[in-house]
A protein has these predicted regions:
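Conserved phosphate-binding catalytic cores of ATP/NTP-utilizing and phosphoryl-transfer enzymes
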Residues: 1, 109-130, 308
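N-terminal beta-alpha supersecondary unit
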Residues: 2-72, 78-82, 111, 115
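Short beta-strand scaffold segments in enzyme catalytic cores
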Residues: 13-19, 131, 139-143
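A contiguous, well-structured pocket-lining segment that forms one wall/lid of small-molecule binding clefts
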Residues: 69, 184-266, 275-283, 288, ...
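Glycine-rich beta-strand-to-loop/alpha-helix junction loops that act as flexible
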Residues: 78-81, 98, 135-137, 267-275
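DPxDG-like acidic metal-binding loop motif
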Residues: 83-102
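Conserved phosphate-binding/catalytic loops in two-lobed NTP-binding clefts
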Residues: 108-109, 283-305, 319
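Glycine-rich phosphate-binding loop plus the immediately following alpha-helix
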Residues: 146-190, 216-217, 221-225
């Protein structure tokens, strides 16, 4: 079965066609980065206008690259949460209209389920496993029992790791997108130059949680206080030390989840899953089977949305055409699986 998936939750206009939840027939992503770089971040109004301008040609290109016409597609899917409301509405409205006009079943897909599924597009991964979902909006550690069944173990109590990367890059005028730039710049610096603080959340409900607001503040406003003797305060050293601290924070919480659950397969997803230091740090743990999506599937893409929708289709479910967009999802709670936060309606 072939599913056409649309993703427009932020600043990428994307469409892909995936067969049987695995075989990517086409995967088109139109990036808006050049339009947002001068503002050092995403401007929601610009993002939604570009989505409206690009959505039709992107969908047409996806069909063309797959050598299909719409009649040969079995279902239509689109992201409906979370994200920028204007951006979500463009892709969701287009997807619902396309499904209605073509007489195809429609599926609204949670963006975060998509990121968690991305690695499944190129790997056969049995459930359950420990999921690490790290992006510009989320930092989640979960026990993943199924494609739409995530048992949340820990999350950020303030900023996401991706947001911290972007804010640090913006303050030091490094450019946008911050995560990619810091990753590259860090290779020129020394991660031992600064000893930045990390929150002590070792017990009880916060055992698996992370926090990045304090780290972000230290890097931006108090860097001099954490500079080690014999090192210079260069942007490369700041980038390397910040990245090292952020990644070690994530990995330390992840290892706790591995120890407590006994699960040794770790699957990552989201934009920050492309970070080279995070990948290398996890690779050092030979006792783990760490699976990352290809770099092209770490960022926003339609293939992950189509992949998730295929499993809803196979299960005989559909989303009503009055499905709405939702900019935010309820605060993740420990033990919450696919109820409030991952609801599609």
């Amino acid at each position: 079965m072939k599913v056409l998936g649309i993703e427009s939750s932020c600043d990428e206009t994307a469409c892909a066609i995936v067969e049987d939840g695995k075989n990517i027939l086409s995967n088109v992503v139109a990036t808006q980065i050049p339009f947002h770089q001068i503002y050092k971040g995403v401007v929601p109004e610009i993002a939604s206008r570009k989505h409206a301008e690009w959505i039709l040609p992107v969908v047409r290109q996806a069909l063309s690259e797959a050598q299909l016409d719409l009649s040969q597609v079995d279902a239509i899917a689109a992201t409906n949460r979370p994200g920028l409301m204007g951006s979500l509405l463009v892709g969701l409205s287009f997807g619902k209209t396309l499904a209605w006009s073509a007489g195809k079943p429609f599926y609204a897909v949670n963006h975060m389920l998509g990121h968690m599924y991305a690695a499944h597009l190129v790997n056969d991964i049995p459930y359950p496993y420990i999921g690490l979902l790290v992006s510009g909006g989320h930092s989640i550690i979960a026990k993943v029992n199924g494609f739409d069944d995530l048992e949340i173990l820990g999350t950020t109590i303030d900023d996401s790791v991706g947001e911290a990367f972007d804010k640090v890059a913006k303050y030091y005028d490094l450019g946008y997108p911050g995560g990619v730039i810091i990753d590259k710049l860090a290779k020129e610096g020394d991660p031992k130059a600064f000893t930045f603080p990390v929150p002590k959340m070792d017990k009880g409900d916060h055992r698996y949680d992370v926090s990045f607001s304090g780290l972000k503040t230290a890097v931006i406003h108090q860097a001099d206080a954490f500079l080690n003797k014999g090192y210079e305060k260069t942007t490369a050293n700041i980038a390397a030390s910040f990245q090292e601290t952020a990644c070690r924070t994530l990995v330390s919480r992840l290892l706790r989840a591995v120890e407590d659950t006994g699960l040794t397969t770790v699957v990552a997803g989201g934009g920050v899953a492309a970070n080279s230091r995070l990948r290398a740090m996890l690779a050092e743990h030979k006792e783990l089977n760490c699976i990352f999506p290809p770099l092209k599937l770490c960022g926003d893409n339609g293939a992950m949305i189509a992949g998730v929708a295929y499993h809803f289709l196979k299960r005989g479910e559909t989303s009503p055409l009055n499905t709405t967009a939702c900019a935010r999802i309820p605060q993740f709670k420990r033990g919450l699986a696919n109820l409030e936060a991952f609801g599609r309606r």
